[in-house]
Structures are given as C-alpha cells and as structure tokens.
A protein has these predicted regions:
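Conserved Helicase C-terminal RecA-like lobe
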Residues: 6, 174-191, 199, 213-332, ...
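Conserved RecA-like ASCE ATPase "motif II neighborhood" in helicase/translocase motors
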Residues: 9-34, 42-57, 323-328
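Inter-lobe coupling linker of SF2 helicases/translocases
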Residues: 9-14, 28, 48-62, 90-240, ...
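Conserved RecA-like P-loop NTPase helicase motor core
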Residues: 44, 294-382, 390
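Conserved helicase ATPase motor motifs in RecA-like P-loop NTPase domains
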Residues: 61-76
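A short helix-turn-beta junction within AAA+ P-loop NTPase domains corresponding to the substrate/partner-engaging
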Residues: 79-93
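A conserved SF2-helicase RecA2
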Residues: 347-353, 360-442
Length: 443
C-alpha cells in the first residue's frame, strides 16, 4: 500500500496499463496528491492518446509541478496541454482575447469576435481556441518570409506565461560552455544535377523512391511534399540519388573530412538524421581516416551496448563517433567530446539540442563547438529559416518577449541574407503549384 510520504514513480508508457489503478488511487485520496511531471513536453500534442490519458488522470491533482527543458518545439499551441494539466480549465486560465484569428482559403489571416472572451478555455476545443487566439499562422518550409508565425494578443499570452513558467537558460547558471558555428557548402555540379532532376523530372523518378498509390488524386496532392522529402535527402546523400554524377562522395562529406584532417584533431561526434547518412559516413571515414578509432551508433542499438561504445569512445584521444541524432537524445552523457557536427537539420532547434547537449554538461571543462553544416542554394536554407522562426516562438515562451529575428540569426551564426536563397512554392494561372529556386521558376 502507498502511505503518506511515499513516492510513486511511473513512466508515461505505463499509464495505459495502470489507468484503472491510478483512478482508484486518486479517488481514495480525493486527488490530494502532488504531481511532479518531468519532461512535460511529452504531452505537447493535445490530440495524442498519451496527452489525453495524462490529463484525465492528473488534472485534478491538488499540487502540480511540471519540468522540461523544451516547453515548446514547433508552435505556441504545444503549450496548451501543459497549461490545461496545471489549471484544469479553471478560472486560472481565462481567455482574455476579444478577437480570434484564422487562415482563410487564400491563407490570409482573418479575424472575428471571440465568443469565449472572459471565460476559461473550454475542455472541448480549448486547443483550437488557444491557436486562434495567439498563433493562427503556421510557418512552412515555403512560407517563412510570409508568416513567420506572428504572435497575436501578445499581452494576454505574456500574462499567462509570466504567472505560470519560471525559465532558467543553461548559460544563465553554467556560463558560456558552447558556441554555435555555421558553415555553408557550395553544392557541386553533381548535387545541383540531383536538385534539377527532382524538380524537373520528378514524375520520371517518383517510382524509384515511393510506392505507387491507387488513389491518383491523393498521389497528385502529395507531389510537393514528396519533392521536399527528396530535396532534403539530396542534402545528405545526393550521391545515392538519380541524376548524380561526379565524385564518389558529396561536397558536405568532403568539407567534414577537411575539418577532421586539419582542425578537429580531438574527439568528434557527427550527428546524422538518416541511416543512409550514417552508413555513408562510416564508409567515408574508414577510407579517409583508418588510423582514428571509429564508433557507430544507430537507433536499434541497445542501451547497454550503446553505453559500452560511448565509454570506449570517451577513452580515446581522437575517436570519431557517427550516430543518428535521435539515438542520443537522452539518458547518456559524453562530457569529454569538444566538437559536435550537425550533418543534417531536424525540424526544430530543441530536437537538435537534445542531441548536442549530451556533450555539453554542467561539469564540462573547456568550450564546446557545435557546427551546423548546410548546403547553400538548397532546401536546407528553408529548413534553417523554419527552425529559426520556431525558435523565435520558443524564446517568447521562455521570457515573454518577442525576440528580434536578427538576434536569433546572430545567436546561430546565420546571415539574414538566407531569405534570398530560399526555395518557394508558387501557383501558376491554372492553379497548379510549382517550386521556385531563388529567382528562377522551375515547374
């Protein structure tokens, strides 16, 4: 039996199996328990089963403390589920916004009167109202310069954040432990040929990467989404794709090779986003640096094996670790590695921080260097602009103030001229979408 003063430790993955037991537990104690929820960002999706289950079980707890290093990742709406868990749709989370906003058919922002003004956010439809009140626009890969996820009713949102969230940044209590360095690589002739093949001959290569669909109308609607997928893949392993010609390894890999040979003589970690990239760098580094110890970790590696590999990596002087960023996002520390290379971008900064903060710890000695390596004149510039637009919102949630774009760009060592190199989605006279590459139209 659980007596007063005891701690009950449970993982989110177990809540489904223990739902009935926890309901009985909460009822017997009249909800007079203290909930301490670590990594509360795991319930940022208000429609996910995990979120609904957590809220159902613990929303009436008398005391609640939520802790996370990443309150939001992609949108301010991700804050709502955590607020709902804390305040249980009570008078502590009243919607003071008199106007709500939404996107019309032309993707322009329209507004209307808020029927729920001066009432608590409702249990049903509260997340939708939260979005309409504060952040109706959604930044996309092609729409950074148009929307930039503007924040509406800022004063009301700031008031809610100020009374709820206490933020401490890593640099505030640990000092300057790391710096971010951005490198852009000029695509080679072969890489540019891959981009052109994807955009101009997509219908010819579609079957090489995607299975055919019976619903041709749906397949047509997925065209641009699939093109984006291939353009992103072409920024990591273009030499494995249709249309490539030239050197056996891409320009990005060769730049990393030069850095390893002439600058990065100590331990180095390379974070990839796909297994194809991990395999490519494993082959490339074995060929170019046979004298340096090489360690490879993929997502299917068990925890004990992973920890054993990291312990061996720690004991080397000039070892190279190649892994997927997702495989090292939690539960491990590698305090002695000073150089971390982000080979490809994930969809938001917090996800990438979860990876490279495995190497940046409170007790780390010396400066850590995080290298973002991207192709210029490629979809990666859209991705970079997208993650920085999201980071601007994340900063607002942390401190209640709108950070200037220039400050975010400076923090991540990015030139504001990035906007001029973006791929864009446009519509022709017949209503068909096409992709623009810089100032040039490519159907």
């Amino acid at each position: 039996a659980v007596v007063p003063g005891m701690f009950v430790l449970v993982s989110l993955t177990m809540l489904g199996d223990l739902k009935a037991a926890f309901k009985t537990f909460m009822k017997r104690r009249s909800n007079k328990i203290c909930l301490i929820f670590d990594e509360s960002d795991e319930i940022t999706n208000p429609y996910a089963l995990r979120t609904r289950l957590t809220t159902e079980l613990f929303r009436r707890s008398e005391f609640k403390l939520l802790a996370t290093g990443t309150t939001t990742r992609n949108s301010i709406v991700e804050l709502y589920s955590q607020l709902e868990l804390m305040y249980n749709n009570s008078v502590n989370m009243i919607c003071y916004a008199s106007r709500v906003y939404f996107e019309d058919k032309e993707r322009n922002i329209a507004e209307k009167y808020n029927e729920y003004c001066l009432r608590p956010f409702p249990a049903r439809g509260g997340a939708k109202l939260f979005r309409a009140s504060f952040c109706p626009g959604k930044a996309t890969v092609f729409g950074i310069e148009k929307h930039n996820q503007d924040i509406y009713n800022q004063s009301h949102l700031s008031e809610l954040i100020d009374k709820t969230i206490i933020t401490r940044k890593f640099k505030e209590f640990a000092g300057d432990k790391y710096e971010i360095i951005n490198y852009t690589v000029s695509p080679g002739v072969g890489e540019r040929a891959v981009y052109r093949t994807i955009m101009e001959k997509f219908h010819e290569i579609l079957h090489l990467y995607f299975n055919p669909m019976k619903d041709k109308n749906k397949e047509s609607h997925l065209k641009i989404a699939r093109q984006i997928q291939l353009l992103i893949k072409a920024c990591s392993v273009p030499h494995q794709m249709s249309g490539y010609h030239g050197d056996p390894y891409p320009e990005k890999a060769k730049l990393i090779g030069r850095k390893l040979r002439f600058e990065l003589r100590g331990k180095v970690a390379i974070g990839c986003t796909s297994l194809d990239a991990v395999a490519m760098y494993e082959e490339f580094l074995k060929e170019r640096f046979p004298q340096r110890p090489l360690f490879v970790i993929r997502g299917n590696v068990g925890f004990k094996t992973r920890q054993h590999l990291l312990d061996k990596f720690e004991k080397t002087k000039d070892g190279i670790l190649v892994c997927t960023q997702q495989s090292l996002r939690s539960s491990v520390n590698v305090p002695s590695c000073e150089d971390i290379i982000i080979e490809s971008l994930l969809w938001n900064i917090p996800r990438m921080e979860q990876f490279y903060f495995r190497f940046i710890r409170l007790d780390s000695e010396g400066m850590r260097h995080v290298y973002y390596i991207t192709y210029e004149d490629s979809i990666e510039q859209n991705l970079m602009a997208l993650v920085l637009a999201k980071e601007r919102l994340n900063e607002f949630v942390k401190n209640g103030k709108v950070t200037e774009e220039s400050d975010i760009f400076e923090e991540f060592d990015i030139s504001p001229d990035i906007i001029e190199t973006l791929f864009r989605r446009e519509k022709d006279d017949k209503g068909n979408f096409y992709i623009c590459w810089g100032a040039q139209k490519v159907s």
